Every structure is written in C-alpha cells, then in structure tokens.
C-alpha cells in the first residue's frame, strides 16, 4: 500500500445535519473534544473571556448563537483523520448547506429525542438521498424527557424513508437515564454526566443477564428486558452494505450536553463510514488514490478574518496530494497558479498547510477569480458534476439608502452571490436589483454583511416573484422569440445566466406549456 493510499484510507469526511436546536453545535464541540481538539469544549477564550461556540464565528452568528456559515474542522481520532463539516442549522439557511453535502462521503443526523424528525431534517435528508449518502443517526437529549424510542425509530423510517437499525438502546431517560445497552455486543454503558471539557471514564457492565446489570437497572430490569425483546423482534439489524448504499441508518442514543454517546457515533463513522469515494467528473471518474491532484470548490466564504479583507475558497480534494507551493491548473480559466498558502481549518483557527490528501478540505485565498464549482488539477481538464444552484424561494427588491453607493452595492452583492450567501438578479427591463434566498434569515445576513464589510446600507421591498427558473433553449430562433415575448419577466443572474422570474405558479405553468422548446430549470450546475 502506497503512503498515499494509506493516507486516503485514514480519512473520514462527514457533515452534521439537524433541525435548529437539536443540539448540533454541542455535538460538534464534543466531537472535537474526542479528538482533543478543544481543551474546554465550547470555549475559545477571548480577552473578555466570553464563551462562544467554537464553530460559530461570524458576527451575526455570535449574536444569535446559531451556525449560519459552514465551518470545517479537522482533527485526529483513533489513527484516523476526521474532516467534520458543520452545516448551518438555523431555520433559515442557504443553499450553502446543500452544497456542503456535495463535499462529504457520509453524514451524521442529530435528532432531538423530545421532538423527533423535524422539517429541516427532512429537507437535508432529501439532499443526502440525491447522492445516496450513508447516514449515522444520533438521538440526542436523553438527559431530558424524550418520546418513546420505538416511536422515534418508526418515525425515522416512515418520514425519512430509510431503514433504522438501533445499535444502542436507552435505559430510561431524564432523571432516570442510566445509560445505554449495546444490542449486538450485550453490554451496558453506564451514564455519568460529563459536562464541558470533562471526558469521563466509561463504566461498562458486561452481560445483561449479570447480577451487576440487575442491580444497576433495579426495578426497571424486567420491563427493560421485555422492551428489548420487542425491539429485537421488530427492528432491522445493521447491515454494512445497506448503510453504504444509503438505505439503512445505524441509530445511537445519548446526550451531547452530558458528553455521553458521542464517542459511539464517532466510532461508527471510523468503523463503518466510507473512506473518500471516487468522484464523477464530466470526462471520467476520478479515483481518490490517483497520483495526480484534483479538487473542486464547493463554497466561498468572504471575510473569514475581519483583520484581513479576504475571501477563502473551500476545496474538497478528490485525488492526489496537495503539497505546499505546488502548481495547479485553474481549469475554468485555463491558467496555472502556484498555491503556497493553502489553509487547513480548525474552526476559526487557521493554519498553513504542508500537505493534504483526498477527502481533506483545504482553503485557498481568493482574490475574486475563484467561483463555486471551479476545478483545480495538475493540468487535466476536468469538471466535477453535481454542485448545483437551487432556485430561490423568497425574493426582495433592494433599495439603497445612499444612491451614490450603487457601485459598492453591486460589488458587494456580486461577491456575496459568488459565495452562495444569496442570489442576485438584474431584470432586463429596469434598473432594479432583486435578491433571491432559500430562507428569510439570508436577507438579514446580506444586509448586515453589506453594512459591516462594504459600508453600504440597504433596505428591502416586497416584489411579486413566485420563483425563478434558469432558461435554456437549443433553438436560437425560438429563444429569441421567447425573449421578445417574455422580456417583462426576464433577468440575468449574478453569473450572467438568463433567468425567468415567474410572478405566480400559474404563470410559470402557462409559460412552460406555451414554450415547449424552452427549458425552465429549477437548478443549475455551477460552470
């Protein structure tokens, strides 16, 4: 096995998906703690010594305590290298989240044991299903009142259309939470709360039939054994292949806040989740063990460091090895660039990188030339597929408070659109600027970032747009006819693509019927 193949085999790259408030930020911190990456989970002490979650860094995130931007963290665990991508958990997230899921090989779904499957989880699972991403599930908050665990498993299966195979089973909950029982290996892991940075030593009781197990469960023993028989009779058994194919999810129970059960999940990722997978490019399939470097950009983040007005492009390495100072071909521009200062991420801490392998996420300094979906190789012309733009669901017209700043506004919006914080449309028949978003919070984020980073103040006005569709037509003459007829509703997006802004659902249906040769697309690939 070559050194490169050995390095690839060590990698596990996964994202955490959850509904807001299911405990995602807490579990992220505890995972980092497992890799001893944070000394006190949740504390990166600033001079004021205020506690902010380690992976929530943008000003607005600090104020609201939610992760709006995708963070990337790398840490070692059990001779493996873990790349953890944190996705925005807030009610209103952007397509940033969807795109992050194109850069991982597996995902960890966190559910609130008191609430079960929630709307945002469903949306994220739909995206995972597009790529058959393997999912590990963690039912959180067992230190509080939770719903009946069997009911929770039924809900996962019915709503998320995936088989659920419990690996551990909870013994009580809330004040009576005594730990979990490992179904396949017949042992109990005793619950002792470890808060903050405490890593408690795990106490294990072998064999449910033992006197020690009976003493630990007390009066609950008979009822628990009865429940287990029911569970083992009714639930799916874990099957590695079905998990890899995205058809079955292993389910673990615990409490991230109490620092219990998180290590079981991380062990599952190391033991069962796939190492970096082959990636499909337009030209061919790229294998991770190949010698030549290839990677794609799935996200651009502006101003990660207020001290430097910089933008960072996040790249997933698909094959080969990055070495400091190496020459790469920026395929879209056909230009060779020397990259001497790629970054690795440990949340807001960044370090210069000497080398990286397939599965790793690295950061490139971007001075406006890199776009989402761009490919970098050692010369080969490759373009990776499946990094989509999604049609926005909400629209606002932008009004500038100071008309003299229209240049700064356009520049700011162009940059924010490039990094996926919003989508911007310029109607053909007016000088309006229209913003599109997947969630309302995106508009707030854009306004506050325009103000902080570009010194532009703007307000929003409602606008009658129901949805956007990207336009394509092979027949030039037909396209011209369509453009003349539909000019009132046509716009160009930030990437220069022709877009139809449909005022109503009915209008869109009519247009699609009237113009069968014109393709109205709800997603568009980054080119």
Curated annotation (Swiss-Prot):
What Gene Ontology terms describe where this protein resides (cellular component)? cytosol
Per UniProt, subcellular location reads as: Cytoplasm
Q: Which residues are listed for GTP binding in this entry?
A: 18-25, 86-90, 140-143
Q: Tell me one GO molecular function of this protein.
A: GTP binding
Q: Where is the tr-type G domain?
A: 9-277
Show the Pfam families listed in the entry. EF-G_D2, GTP_EFTU, RF3_C
Name where it mostly resides.
Answer: cytoplasm
| GO terms classed as biological process | regulation of translational termination
Record InterPro entries: EF-G-like_DII, EFG_III/V, G_TR_CS, P-loop_NTPase, PrfC, RF3_C, RF3_dom_3_sf, RF3_GTP-bd
Listed transmembrane segments: none
User: Could you confirm whether the keyword Cell wall biogenesis/degradation appears in this record?
Assistant: no
**Disulfides per UniProt:** none
Could you list this entry's UniProt keywords, alphabetically sorted. Answer: Cytoplasm, GTP-binding, Nucleotide-binding, Protein biosynthesis
- Described function: Increases the formation of ribosomal termination complexes and stimulates activities of RF-1 and RF-2. It binds guanine nucleotides and has strong preference for UGA stop codons. It may interact directly with the ribosome. The stimulation of RF-1 and RF-2 is significantly reduced by GTP and GDP, but not by GMP.
PANTHER family per the UniProt record, alphabetical: PEPTIDE CHAIN RELEASE FACTOR RF3 (PTHR43556:SF2)
**Family as reported in the entry's similarity comment:** Belongs to the TRAFAC class translation factor GTPase superfamily. Classic translation factor GTPase family. PrfC subfamily.
What is the name of the protein in this document?
Answer: Peptide chain release factor 3
């Amino acid at each position: 096995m070559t050194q490169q193949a050995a390095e690839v085999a060590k990698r596990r790259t996964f994202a955490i998906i959850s509904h807001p408030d299911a405990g995602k930020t807490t579990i992220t911190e505890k995972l980092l703690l497992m890799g001893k990456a944070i000394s006190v989970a949740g504390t990166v002490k600033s001079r004021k010594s205020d506690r902010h979650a380690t992976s929530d860094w943008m000003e607005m995130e600090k104020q609201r305590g939610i992760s709006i931007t995708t963070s990337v963290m790398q840490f070692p665990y059990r001779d493996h290298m873990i790349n953890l991508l944190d996705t925005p958990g807030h009610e209103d997230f952007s397509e940033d989240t969807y795109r992050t899921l194109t850069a991982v090989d597996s995902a960890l779904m966190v559910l609130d044991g008191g609430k079960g499957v929630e709307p945002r989880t469903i949306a994220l699972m739909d995206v995972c299903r597009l790529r058959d991403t393997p999912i590990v599930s963690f039912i959180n908050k067992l230190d509080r009142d939770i719903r009946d665990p069997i009911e929770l498993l039924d809900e996962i299966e019915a709503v998320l259309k995936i088989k659920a195979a419990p690996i551990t089973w909870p013994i009580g909950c809330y004040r009576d939470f005594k730990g979990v029982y490992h179904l396949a290996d017949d042992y109990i892991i005793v619950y002792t709360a470890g808060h903050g940075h405490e890593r408690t030593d795990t106490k294990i009781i072998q064999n449910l039939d033992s006197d020690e197990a009976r003493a630990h469960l007390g009066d609950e023993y008979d009822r628990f054994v009865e429940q287990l028989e029911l569970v083992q009779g009714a639930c799916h058994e874990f099957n590695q292949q079905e998990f890899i194919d995205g058809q079955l999810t292993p389910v673990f129970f615990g409490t991230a806040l109490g620092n219990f059960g998180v290590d079981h999940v991380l062990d599952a990722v190391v033991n069962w989740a796939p190492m970096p997978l082959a990636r499909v490019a337009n030209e061919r399939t790229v294998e991770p063990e190949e010698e030549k470097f290839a990677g794609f950009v799935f996200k651009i983040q502006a101003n990660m460091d207020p001290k430097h007005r910089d933008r960072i492009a996040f790249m997933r390495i698909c094959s080969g090895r990055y070495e400091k100072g190496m020459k790469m071909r920026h395929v879209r521009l056909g230009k060779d660039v020397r990259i001497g200062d790629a970054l690795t991420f440990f949340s807001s801490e960044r370090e210069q990188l000497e080398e990286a392998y397939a599965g790793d996420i690295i950061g490139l300094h971007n001075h406006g030339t890199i776009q989402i979906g761009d490919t970098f190789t050692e010369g080969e012309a490759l373009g990776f597929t499946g990094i989509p733009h999604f049609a926005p669901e909400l629209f606002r017209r932008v009004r500038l408070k100071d008309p003299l700043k229209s240049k700064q506004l356009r520049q700011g919006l162009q940059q924010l659109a490039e990094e996926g914080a919003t989508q911007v449309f310029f109607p053909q028949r007016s000088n309006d600027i229209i913003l599109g978003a997947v969630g309302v919070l995106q508009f707030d984020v854009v306004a506050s970032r325009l103000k902080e980073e570009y010194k532009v103040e703007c307000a929003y006005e409602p606008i009658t747009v129901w949805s956007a569709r990207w336009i394509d037509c092979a027949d030039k003459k037909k396209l011209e006819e369509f453009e003349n007829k539909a000019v009132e509703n046509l716009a160009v997006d930030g990437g220069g693509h022709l877009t139809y802004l449909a005022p109503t659902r009915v209008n869109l249906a009519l247009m699609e019927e009237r113009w069968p040769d014109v393709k109205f697309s709800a997603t568009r690939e980054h080119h």
